[in-house]
Amino acid sequence: MRIGFLALTLAVMLWFNFGQQSSAGAMIQRSADLLDDRPARSILIVGTSRTFQNDMPAMLRAIADSAGNPNKFQIESSTYGGATFKTHWSKKRTRQLLATGWDDVILQPESGAQTWQQGNDDFLSFGPKLAAAAQLSSGRPRLVVGWPYDSKAYEEEDYAAAGFGRSEHLQLIKEMHAKLASDANLDRINVAGAWERARLSNPSIQLTSDGNHPTVAGSYLYALAVYAQLSNGPVAQVTYVPDGLSDNDAKALREAVDAVPRLL
């Protein structure tokens, strides 16, 4: 009873000390971290449902812990389904979080930004605004280079009529993310490269649930790619495997991440 009361008291104190912008999950983790004497590494992820699906940030923390990282990853996120960079710029919470101060800030764009002109224009216009608003202790913000949809999605009439398929979309994603990274001084996280490697070398592993959103395997792959860049090292030593994923599939996904460049 006393332990539960103490945990509740600590959570309330943290809520006032670290600000009401923090999510419930982040506050619970910070309460638990009071018993962890490793130095903290604060990470903010600004993104969409691709990030909150299967609680990818929690996977990232578990991956880091299982790999014996010397830091405890304290991860906060501002994520909304279908959110564009323009959407995030209009969100008071996102802007307040960016201004709080972090060791790392990760920007994960809308999945369809490169499928239409206005979406790509907003991506290139508001990405730099978010990056400039990020208060970092050192380094620069990071941009997730995400995966294109599954091939079947491009059979829709508008895509088919324009001759816009998966390979064209992937190429445009790479080009526009490279441009934004150059314009806004961002590091790029090579999720797309790991995704393609896993998709081609292990086609039996289902990475999406609907052609877009990640399965548990897809979220694990995404989190591994993020960790590989944050730690600037291989993920072969990661032992964490999420529920619902076999050890063999998890090993194959770790190998896919280690087979592609971490830095772009």
Residue spans for each PLM region:
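N-terminal secretory targeting modules
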Residues: 1-46, 50-58, 65, 69, ...
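Alpha-helical cap/lid subdomain in secreted, periplasmic
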Residues: 95-216, 228, 237
